[in-house]
Amino acid sequence: HLCILKIHSALTILCLLCTIHCAAAPQKAVSDTLLSARFNRYARENPIEKLYLHQDRTNYYAGETIWFKVYQTLSSSATEASRIVYIDLSNSKGEIVKQVKYPLADGAASGSLSIPEHLHAGHYQLRAYTRWMQNFDPEFFFHRELTIYGNSEKDNIPQQTTKFKLRFFPEGGNLINGLTSRIAFEVVDANTGKGVQTEGVILNAHGDSIRKFATSHLGKGSFFFIPQKKEKYIARLAGDNTDFKIPSISEQGFVMTVKHLKEALRILLTQNIGPSTKNSVYSLILHQEGRLIAVLPVDGSQPRTLFDLPLDKLPTGVFTLTLIDEDYHAYCERLVFTHFPETLNLKLSSTISVQEGHRKMSVNIRSTDKKGIPQPGSFSLAVAQTFLEQPTIRDNFSTYLFLSSNLKGQTEQPLSYWNPEDTESLSKIELLLLTQGWRRYSLEVFNQPDNLPRY
């Protein structure tokens, strides 16, 4: 069966042609007009503000100064930008050891933060936010981990015994009895939070091996699994006798599986709810940062529904797929990334002159688009000694704006995911979204009383 999907855009209304593989025509979807109105209202009342900090480096000695430039971005629904940015430096206990604030002008601010001389060596966190951002989950503040060394040779960063933490993340949110599910997982060092490359096995209550698994990138991986509610499962890692729990298994529900094809995004919905869904109205919605992109009807009476969405009609960066019913309750959800953004071509040229015994470097920057047409921009340049900086372990502006800022917490080695020329990049991003991609926008807010901003 063929259906026309309405794609909502600020510029125009497009259509996606998708194929639905099922035995009967799907019923009418949730009213996209009403849903769009709800999204627009929520986006208007809760505009998204993001900050990015460009620093001189990420390794410092106590007593040194952190130099930075702050960049501010706003969602299209924002009518006013915050005027003050707050920047905190906190220790491993979450205690703020230094805070500064700067005025924002034209979406930017330049400044510095002096590191107290008495600080002990260790890992610290630099955090940036505005008062408006404090109305939402602080996990979406700008975060960056710093290493600060003490002034004494004896003041070394303490070494801790390695202890593993293993967590499982069913694609779409839940494990459903008897339905094949993709389960992503992450193995990290409990002390550092860094990914650990290892392998493990799923065991049943009798100790029988049900499924082996292995990490593929920075402690992350995935495998397919058919859970049985009557069984009890545990997981163990190689060389570790710790028993790790598998997420609970629901008797009934939906499972969402997403696969990247050459020219389409394939979405498979399976369910075992049964006859009670024959008169139910379900919709799979695509949305991004509070903006509704598409509404796809789903026939609740069918055990399987398959969509193939043309990639050239999908947005750049991260967007969300959510399956809802007519009361706007979410059944499963996941984040998806399909397109890298277009970037400017920057060409740097420099000249060096000697003045009063010192060398002075002048740098010229030429910015053009992919057609070679010059483009204006706001730029910052950091210069640091190589042993004090590890640029590959932190975000750049593109990775943060289009990827990491949509995830909770910090992304380990974000540049390892960001290579449009690498055929493995999308697979790595998939694992990142499946493990750290907790949803930013809960549709349950549509069914709750209005909450006034605290700030």
Segment roles from a protein language model:
Residues 1-34, 365:
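Bacterial Sec-dependent N-terminal signal peptides
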Residues 49-77, 165-192, 264-270, 322, ...:
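Beta-strand-rich structural segments
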Residues 119-120, 130-139, 239-244, 323-333:
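Short acidic/polar inter-strand loop motif in beta-rich domains
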Residues 75, 110-121, 220-232, 310-316:
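Short, surface-exposed loop/turn segments at beta-strand-coil junctions that are enriched for proline
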Residues 40-49, 154-164, 243-249, 335-343:
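Proline/serine/threonine-rich low-complexity linkers at boundaries of modular beta-sandwich domains
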Residues 30, 136-158, 373-453:
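Acidic glycine/proline-rich low-complexity segments
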Residues 105-113, 216-222, 292-295, 301-308:
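Aromatic sugar-binding surface patches on proteins
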Residues 76-100, 180, 191-208, 278-282, ...:
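Short flexible loop/turn segments that cap and initiate beta-strands
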